[in-house]
From Swiss-Prot:
Entry keyword annotation includes Transcription: no
Function comment: Part of the phosphoribosylformylglycinamidine synthase complex involved in the purines biosynthetic pathway. Catalyzes the ATP-dependent conversion of formylglycinamide ribonucleotide (FGAR) and glutamine to yield formylglycinamidine ribonucleotide (FGAM) and glutamate. The FGAM synthase complex is composed of three subunits. PurQ produces an ammonia molecule by converting glutamine to glutamate. PurL transfers the ammonia molecule to FGAR to form FGAM in an ATP-dependent manner.
Keyword Disulfide bond on entry: no
Listed name of the protein: Phosphoribosylformylglycinamidine synthase subunit PurQ
Location(s) in or outside the cell: Cytoplasm
Keywords: ATP-binding, Cytoplasm, Glutamine amidotransferase, Hydrolase, Ligase, Nucleotide-binding, Purine biosynthesis
Any one of the GO BP annotations: 'de novo' IMP biosynthetic process
Stretches assigned to the Glutamine amidotransferase type-1 domain: 2-224
Natural source organism: Halobacterium salinarum (strain ATCC 700922 / JCM 11081 / NRC-1)
Chief location bin: cytoplasm
Active site per UniProt: C85, H202, E204
UniProt gene name: purQ
EC number: 6.3.5.3, 3.5.1.2
Cross-referenced InterPro entries: Class_I_gatase-like, PRibForGlyAmidine_synth_PurQ
Assembly, per entry: Part of the FGAM synthase complex composed of 1 PurL, 1 PurQ and 2 PurS subunits.
Amino acid sequence: MTVAVVRFGGSNCDRDAVRALAHLGVDAAVAWHDDGLPADTDGVVVPGGFSYGDYLRAGAMAAQSPVVAEVRALAADGVPVLGVCNGAQIGCEAGLAPGAFTTNASARFQCERVHLRVENATTPWTAAYSEGDVLEIPIAHGEGRFEIDDDAYADLVADDRVLFRYCNADGEVTEAANPNGSTGAVAGVTGDRDHVAVMMPHPERATLPALGATDGQGILGAFA
């Protein structure tokens, strides 16, 4: 599989993603947004950062880029697409996934390791885990609060499209374990089909043993 890691002006996690994927044996390379996606692309990561300085809303400007239209077209053809942090914001703004990511309830940038509970282990992104598994994955965001209206949230849950929820080390979903005030403590969801996903935590920062955590390997392993 050849994975394109899309870089916008302000992206800063693209090389991290490439290195993490390479560690898993995946052929990955950075694709500058103005150049479009390589013809042989059969996987896409939209990485973290601050595309276009987060002006208007985080991810709003990048979502209008022509390369995102290419990503949508590939997603429609069944190509796996993962948006991480700013990439998750872009994905929601572009309609690849439901909801939106807004300012943290704390109104602060938060950079820390958190725990995630696997809610659905039947997707490509979670097939390496079992339902209820607890992962330790870092976050680093100021606008990571997942928000969605009540009816859409009910549909999301009913359709089993929640991938991860923030939890404590024992797997309990509590207010204290929800770092940003996300609706339902949601940390990641799928699009209309489960080969498209967005998540706020950074699996690429929990893939290399040298980083002290490897729980993210199973997520990025969907591209392997």
